[in-house]
């Protein structure tokens, strides 16, 4: 075989010409020690706080403690495969998550990876999970209602778009039920072809809950047709503490996409006490100094920087909004514990749920006396303002009188009348789960209550009266509901028609 020297030199020259000098430079460290979801890493001198790092087996982590001789890394996953002496790579990116409409209808983990078996996420954009909240200039005061569909809340403790309203109570008092009903109530707003300014997308963040509970929640959303406008972020009880810590920030970033693009979203953190516990665990393992109840000193900042990201933006910034409904679980109704007082002071009001009321059959078990909305009637329609102003005062008087009435048996007629009305209004505010009411339906029901049409009825008949009145108004007298819905007001003309209908119905009902 004849090989010519010229050919060989040509081939060699060709090979040398195509030889690239691009060498990939990555900063690499070594694991000094690992355990309890925390790794101490040596050699990552230029790593940023909050930067994502990658271990040899592909597990991700986040650099939290930057010390002189090592870096404390929290691990987003199992630490079993990570051994002392293994290498750790910098990724040069701060922890981020996919955002956009491609996430709607999906269930993701705390880093935005799908866990529902429906294939990869169709999202083109990624955003950092921990960003600064909007400043003072882009904001606008809350001025439009975020209807929950629950009479007790929409009438007495109204929530507006862009507000932060805390749902607080002991375990098993119906906190998640309120959140679920709120999501289901947005279905009429999110119909196909509705204007973006009307729609309200929902993000539900489950922190430290049982997997079965989250699966049940998702199943209900799917059955009721609410999953298509919702995103579920799940960091369950079996997930490592860093995942439970980061999940609310991930969900918030997904909600912010809608807020910043002139749309509206509501985010439910269920619940933040479990996030605080996860953060306490991480902080203590990172050897940060403990404070009250062994929580780290910056646990207030943890929640305030998260909840400040919920805002109503002004027209120059797209007029979008992000409403936050954080949930806090108390122990034995103790609202004065560390985390509950922190979150109460950060939010714009709280819905306080009580075990005693729950077991008395008053559900939703809202304690109307202790619950407040610091946004108030600016988050209500004119129609609701007209009827709800009375019910607040009457219930306050009723609570005061009921306390005294226990001692005296001979009550004068006016006190007796007040107690009767209060008992019926309390009955009127009860509502079964999965049956949210539209704003105009709530208005007519409360109108009947505050104007004394229930006073002659036995308390047990109040529910039947309400159902009958609503079916009459949805059927023959649908014009009244339409008038209230379109004008968002209870005009004198509509009020007169409504009065006539309620009066004639009350006569036939009795």
Curated annotation (Swiss-Prot):
Record NCBIfam families: atpA, PRK13343.1
Protein name, as recorded: ATP synthase subunit alpha
Keywords from the named record: ATP synthesis, ATP-binding, Cell inner membrane, Cell membrane, CF(1), Hydrogen ion transport, Ion transport, Membrane, Nucleotide-binding, Translocase, Transport
A GO molecular-function annotation: proton-transporting ATP synthase activity, rotational mechanism
Source organism: Rhodopseudomonas palustris (strain HaA2)
SUPFAM superfamilies in the cross-refs: C-terminal domain of alpha and beta subunits of F1 ATP synthase, N-terminal domain of alpha and beta subunits of F1 ATP synthase, P-loop containing nucleoside triphosphate hydrolases
InterPro entries referenced in this protein's UniProt entry, alphabetically: ATP_synth_asu-like_sf, ATP_synth_asu_C, ATP_synth_asu_C_sf, ATP_synth_F1_a_nt-bd_dom, ATP_synth_F1_asu, ATPase_a/bsu_AS, ATPase_F1/V1/A1_a/bsu_N, ATPase_F1/V1/A1_a/bsu_N_sf
PANTHER family: ATP SYNTHASE SUBUNIT ALPHA, MITOCHONDRIAL (PTHR48082:SF2)
Membrane topology type: Peripheral membrane protein
One cellular component (GO) term of this entry: plasma membrane
